[in-house]
Every structure is written in C-alpha cells, then in structure tokens.
Amino acid sequence: MNTLLVGINVAVMLILVGVLYYMQRKHVSFNKRVFTALGIGIIFGLILQFIYEPTSKVIIESNTWFGLIGSGYVKLLQMIVMPLILVSIISAFTKLQLTKNLGKISGLIIGILILTTGIAAAVGIAASAGFDVSATGLQQGDAESARLKLVEERFTSIEKTTIPDKLLELLPTNPFLDLTGARPTSTISVVIFAAFIGIAFIGVKRKYPEQAELFKKMLDAVYAIVMRMVTLILRLTPYGVLALMAKTVAGSDINAILKLGNFVLASYVALIVMFVIHLLLIALSGLNPIQYLKKVFPVLTFAFTSRSSAGAMPLNIEAQKEKLGISEGIANFAASFGVSIGQNGCAGIYPAMLAMMVAPTVGIDPLQPQFILTLIAVVAISSFGVAGVGGGATFAALIVLSTMNLPIGIVALVISVEPLIDMGRTALNVSGSMTAGLISSKWLGELDQDTYNQDDTKTGEIAS
C-alpha cells in the first residue's frame, strides 16, 4: 500500500514538473517560474502534511524520490562552484580588473561582512531579550540525544584548534584537495590560490608577454565553457525549488515547531530586521533598495529552499554581475568570501541567540553590557571559516558557546526546528554577501549604475 501511495506522490510531482516545463516552453519569465515553483511546492507539501504524518514511511520515501530533483540540483550547483571561483577570479586578473585595487577590494568586502555579522549578533541579542527566549523547559528526546552525541564529537575537534591554527587553515596547503571542497575553509583557500595565480600572471605578462597572452586565451576559452555550464544548470532552478520546498514542508514536524514557536518567531523577526538593515545600508550608499530587492529575490528564494549558501553561489555571482551591475572581480570575491566569512544568519544571529538562551542556566545575566559586548565581539571574530553548507551554523554556534564558556547542549535541543530556521538564515547569508559586493562596488566606483537602475524586464534574465 505504501508503495502505491509513494508512486502517486511521485507522479504528482512529475506532473508539477511538467507544468513548469510547459511554462518554460511558453517563454514565461524565469522569475515567474521560480515564484510559481515556490508556491506550488509549499501547497503540495502542505497537502502531503495534511494527508500523512511527517514521520510516516510514505512521506520519508516520497521525500527520498523528491530528493532526486531537489538535492540533485543542489549537487549540480555545488559541482560548478569551485571551478567557477577559480576561473572567474583568475580571469578578473587577466582582464586587469583587480590589479590596482586588490587589497582595497578584499579588505572592504571582508570588513563589511564582519561588520554586518556584528550587527546581526546585536539584532539576535535584542530579539532574544524582546521575546524572552529561554532554554528552560526544553526537552531532550531520542533525536535530540543523537544530535547531542554528534555535537559533542564535533566540539572535541573544535576545542583542540587554536585561533592561529584556524587562521592557518585558510591557506591552501593542497589546492587540488580544496577544489573538491573537502575542508570548511576550502572556498577561501581556492580564492587565495586563484589570487596567487592572477598575481603571477601579471608578473609573467611584464617579462614574457607572449606566454601571458597564450595563457589568457586558454583561460578565456575555459571561462566561456564554465559560464555555459552555469547557465545550463541555472535553467533547472524552478524544478529544484519545487522539489526542495515540497520536501521541506512535507517533512516538517508541526508539533515540534509549535513547542519551540517562540524561538522560531524570535529568529525570523531577527532575520527580517537584519534584512531591512541590509536595505538601509544600500540606501545609505545612494542606491535604490527596492531595485535590489526585486533583482535578488529569485536568488534569495533558491537560498531559502536549498539551505546552501555554497549551492547558491552561481546564482549569486550571476545576479551581481547581470542584474546589479557589479564588476566581475568584486562579484566573485563577495560571493566567495560570503560563503565562509561573516555569514549574517548562520554565524551572526543564530550563535548570539543560543548564547542568550543558555546563559541564565549557568547563572549569567545575559543583559549585562559586558556580556553583550563580549558576545558581539566573539561572534564577529568567530565568523571566519564557517562552511557554506549544511552544518555551518552548528559549527559557528559551537565556537561561540565554547569561547564564552557556555554549555553546548542547547545546539542539540533545537534540532526539531533547525531546517525551518536554517532556510531563513541561508537567505540572509546570501543577501549579506550580495550587499557587501554591491556596497563595495559602489564605493570603489566599479558599479554600472545603468544596469542597476534598469527595470528587470530590460536586463538579461538569470539563466537566459
């Protein structure tokens, strides 16, 4: 019986995929197809929630099949991330876009990311205090116990790593290993490796212009192929969003969400407030925040459904260049740094809120100015090297809680609402990286104002 029901659910999913394909054949815009996929996915997931239990075998098996589309799409995006970073950053050097301002660009982007992470921590602290979020009364079930065991194992490895060691991990000892994304800091390491190649190219160009020109032509060909691959993968976005949203909604435990409703509500209020702060920073830079919102919404939608900052990188870079008018070099640096440094959601709001929740259980008044200022500083500094894939928020929370000498068990006790909150956190992470790129590009005079101010209908569509 279960097999039949699973088959029906999968058949419905395939029909919905067919609807999106029909819309594509009718040349419905990319943005409209993404929004349609988001809405249909939520409705389909809610229907499955209503008919079955979230923990039922039918839902679990159906979600496994849905994962062929949703998770498969995310994996394709992750496949292209490292080649895209490597080729794009080297290409920026060969086109002389980063020669003069490399240090200024890197410093400004990282500075904005760290600053906004500190602000995000303050917002998380305010939300926790405003909603009186507390760890008191949280119950530990089987799922929480299993998660706690994993958390403690991970904490043991983190505890042994000193701050100098963490900084050394950013350097690429084996760039080919980092191209596989094997380490949490692989993205930053690839950026550094690509920058070294770019700097070496500039030196070779002065002494051996013929060899440099040959390298540039080869790189241009590789760059064209990689960007074509990106375009092909991004065309699948509506299908990926549909499957990811349906899977997430269908598998969410409503009862568990209601039990931690105050924490979920406080988290999303903090996320929304921080997103508004992004818009304010853009406005203060002399740009129209409404234009930004309209142009990046499809990217944020995908980040929300996929829960992967790294997976959203190709969309992120494409939107910065084609929609916002950000120069290629800055777009690549901002997206790359934003995956591992200064994530406003995962490394800013989330660790700060957990620290505020657990502090009273060990006799600390979380509203003491000294505690708050220390927490903000620790969160900002600890935001280096947080992986842009699932689990990055846990990694950041463990670092912050251990540095503040607070119990780490709280990380396991909120597992039931982790997927729901992680969706909003990831969208904020991606918005933070694009905001950093946009503001940096504006301040350095690298922004194409005409592209930024154009209506969406006049600019080239993502994945067109």
Swiss-Prot record:
Any single Pfam family the record assigns to this protein: SDF
Report the superkingdom from the record: Bacteria
Record's subcellular location: Membrane
- For the keyword NADP, the answer is no
Q: What is the protein name given in its UniProt record?
A: L-cystine uptake protein TcyP
The record ties this protein, via InterPro entries, to: Na-dicarboxylate_symporter, Na:dicarbo_symporter_sf
Q: Where are the transmembrane segments?
A: 3-23, 34-54, 73-93, 107-127, 184-204, 225-245, 263-283, 347-367, 371-391, 395-415
The family note in this entry says: Belongs to the dicarboxylate/amino acid:cation symporter (DAACS) (TC 2.A.23) family.
Q: According to its UniProt record, where is this protein mainly located?
A: membrane
Q: How does it sit in the membrane?
A: Multi-pass membrane protein
What are this entry's molecular-function GO terms?
A: L-cystine transmembrane transporter activity; symporter activity
Gene Ontology CC entries for this record: plasma membrane
- Organism listed in the record: Bacillus anthracis
Function, as annotated: Mediates uptake of L-cystine, the oxidized form of L-cysteine.
